[in-house]
């Protein structure tokens, strides 16, 4: 089935989906188009801060046990597993 903008599910072709335009509180996401607002790189994620990717080498997951700290890449909002 085709993606439905405004259902709060990130589907194929959507960059974000923050509910209906009346209910969306996300300044990084255009609720009418389900695309990021101009100048925004992201709208969520451990490596996203105020609509921008966090800088490379920013710790996004603290070391535990035998694992090392995990760091943002500066190119994604996801925190990669580096162990």
Swiss-Prot record:
GO terms for molecular function: toxin activity. Transmembrane segments: none annotated. It is found in: Secreted. Pfam families: Disintegrin. Disulfide bonds join 5-24, 16-34, 18-29, 28-51, 42-48, 47-72, 60-79. Signal peptide: none annotated. InterPro entries: Disintegrin_CS, Disintegrin_dom, Disintegrin_dom_sf. A motif (Cell attachment site) lies at residues 64-66. GO terms for cellular component: extracellular region; plasma membrane. SMART domains: DISIN. Keywords: Cell adhesion impairing toxin, Disulfide bond, Hemostasis impairing toxin, Platelet aggregation inhibiting toxin, Secreted, Toxin. Expressed by the venom gland. It comes from the Eukaryota. Residues 2-83 form the Disintegrin domain. Inhibits fibrinogen interaction with platelets. Acts by binding to the alpha-IIb/beta-3 (ITGA2B/ITGB3) on the platelet surface and inhibits aggregation induced by ADP, thrombin, platelet-activating factor and collagen. PANTHER family: ADAM A DISINTEGRIN AND METALLOPROTEASE DOMAIN, DISINTEGRIN AND METALLOPROTEINASE DOMAIN-CONTAINING PROTEIN 28. The disintegrin belongs to the long disintegrin subfamily. Monomer (disintegrin). Belongs to the venom metalloproteinase (M12B) family. P-II subfamily. P-IIa sub-subfamily. This is Disintegrin isoform D-2.
């Amino acid at each position: 089935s085709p993606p439905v903008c405004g259902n709060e599910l990130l589907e194929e072709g959507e960059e974000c989906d923050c509910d209906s335009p009346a209910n969306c509180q996300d300044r990084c996401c255009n609720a009418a188009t389900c695309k990021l607002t101009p100048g925004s790189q992201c709208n969520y994620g451990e490596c996203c801060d105020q609509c921008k990717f966090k800088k490379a080498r920013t710790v996004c997951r603290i070391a535990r046990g035998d694992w090392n700290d995990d760091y943002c890449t500066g190119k994604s909002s996801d925190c990669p597993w580096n162990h």
